[in-house]
């Protein structure tokens, strides 16, 4: 059984074709600059690149080219589109309606449209991608897998904001959380590595990329997470501010005479480690600048590490203890220095790190010592595989 996994952004599209017998990706691809001059599709099969450069005015044209690349006689991996048993779509926001993945039909599409107001940047391209696939592959079942779904198990006192209750009732203003598919995947892998049932464990998962969030997992369920109503909340990130005093936004509008759009740009695109360092949103650049003595770069890293450490401490309290901490995503998987700095100061939990093991980059590995009271893992995330597994489970019933 082969499943196509699609992740549509506003001007890009990532995809994988996964053979579910072996759970191996037969092909991985990226389409860039959709609707912009210089559109390009890059597909990788066994390390070999296949590139298509031609105008792609919309996502439908992009998906046409994806299917063309997959069945290409020389560079493709299937002989016919009928070999694709189902398509799994990453959808950022499922609102309160969806606590798990769902088979897509017209009713689901209407619900996704209703969620656009909750994710105006992310859900529209997700919807466009689904519509394009449904048009091009009308007989192939489609499944929506939501970033928010895993966090629908948050207790009401964790997701409710201390605002007038009618804002929640009438407008859906509450904590939703994101990166759910990643948190779900790495917590389950951690339990496998420990040889224990996830339902018997207390796990804190740290998805640390340009966007970053933490999740507290108890009895296999998300009980707390750092992102909120939007992916802006929580930790300091690459370009996002994370948690700040909300009155700062009023100050920016009233005193600095900034428009709502200008404030939005500042807090989403000009803040985080980029804003503090003035160097970059890429942690490799910031680490390099800090090593060369750039004080603002060092401060940016210190602030970032502090917010992660602070949140791990809070989630240990939420869980009443912790059995395992997992690092994943770009920074979590590849920066030994960041992992070390984040864990520095958590010795009271009984965490002991093996310095040699911690030097590993991008590998699935336990980096804690044998006598560490808390197990610490680096687990490369695989959201595409999780989407494919959900798609198989729903379509094979």
UniProtKB/Swiss-Prot annotation:
Pathway: Metabolic intermediate biosynthesis; acetyl-CoA biosynthesis; acetyl-CoA from acetate: step 1/2. GO terms for cellular component: cytoplasm. GO terms for biological process: acetate metabolic process; acetyl-CoA biosynthetic process. It catalyses: acetate + ATP = acetyl phosphate + ADP. SUPFAM superfamilies: Actin-like ATPase domain. Homodimer. This is Acetate kinase. It comes from Clostridium botulinum (strain Hall / ATCC 3502 / NCTC 13319 / Type A).
